[in-house]
């Protein structure tokens, strides 16, 4: 609701106003400029609701449930260095593809893709998530063993320090180091929400760090916010070719989403769009295609008229 100070967007679709007619000699009101956008937005929303249901995928980016999201607990320090200072660089290496490592004893090769720090997700030890690329030298081992030292398979730079291939980088805890977790991810795409077509970035949420039998409702948490020049420097006036910090521009209304998980009993969906439902590791619902609205009813009726009831 933007019919508040200082915007006073009093657009009311019940009045059937479809244009704002500015007149010479009369000042333009801020609420009229905002109302102009609301009139056009209402048209977009009406069309969008005819085609798509709320939360529908418009431009597919892909969704994926990963029940083999392998986790590994590591010690907080290695060679006297706090490993948290370079974990971000480990997962952002190779343009976000992660860093390949090898077990010093086992010979197992894997790529570190993600990590969480205590107390996130209730973990009490630093946990990395690995995609295994190669089994051990014994031809049987497929997960890093307890106490294993991990060696870099490629160079890694953090700050002013560069670690080279074959340098050791992490050490696993002595007991119960490896487990199988679970995660859910979406690829970049567009979804219809709140009457607009929202760009969604590639993202992933860890469902359970040490279990492949999660039970959750997973989807987008929708966030609506007003952004001012104090929040974003790009909103200051740049008419002279540079940012004029003495001249803040208009605020912006922003809609963004992030992946979130909820219990199976939580149906407070005011700001939540469900994409996936899983119970004890078994998929119960997965929205991976567009969900059509009124137009779907039309095509169903036409098919029935042409071909009858199958």
Feature locations, PLM:
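Subunit-assembly interface segments of extracellular/virion macromolecular structures
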Residues: 1-310
């Amino acid at each position: 609701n933007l019919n508040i100070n200082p915007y006073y967007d009093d657009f009311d679709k019940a009045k059937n106003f479809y244009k704002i007619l500015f007149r010479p000699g009369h000042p333009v009101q801020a609420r009229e400029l905002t109302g102009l956008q609301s009139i056009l937005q209402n048209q977009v929303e009406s069309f969008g609701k005819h085609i798509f249901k709320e939360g529908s995928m418009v431009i597919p980016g892909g969704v994926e449930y990963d029940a083999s999201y392998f986790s590994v607990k590591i010690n907080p320090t290695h060679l006297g260095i706090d490993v948290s200072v370079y974990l971000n660089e480990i997962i952002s290496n190779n343009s976000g593809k992660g860093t390949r490592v090898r077990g010093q004893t086992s010979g197992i090769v894997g790529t570190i893709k993600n990590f969480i720090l205590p107390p996130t997700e209730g973990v009490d030890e630093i946990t990395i998530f690995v995609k295994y690329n190669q089994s051990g030298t014994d031809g049987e081992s497929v997960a890093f063993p307890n106490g294993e030292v991990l060696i870099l398979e490629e160079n890694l730079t953090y700050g002013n320090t560069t670690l080279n291939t074959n340098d050791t980088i992490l050490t696993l805890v002595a007991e119960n180091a490896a487990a199988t977790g679970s995660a859910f991810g979406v690829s970049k795409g567009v979804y219809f929400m709140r009457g607009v077509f929202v760009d969604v970035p590639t993202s992933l949420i860890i469902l359970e760090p040490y279990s492949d039998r999660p039970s959750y409702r997973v989807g987008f948490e929708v966030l609506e916010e007003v952004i001012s020049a104090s929040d974003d420097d790009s909103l200051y006036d740049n008419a002279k070719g540079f940012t004029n910090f003495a001249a803040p521009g208009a605020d912006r209304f922003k809609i963004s989403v992030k992946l979130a998980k909820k219990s199976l009993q939580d149906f407070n969906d005011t700001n939540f769009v469900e994409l996936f439902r899983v119970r004890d590791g078994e998929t119960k619902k997965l929205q991976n295609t567009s969900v059509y609205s009124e137009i779907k009813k039309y095509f169903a009726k036409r098919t029935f008229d042409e071909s009858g009831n199958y």
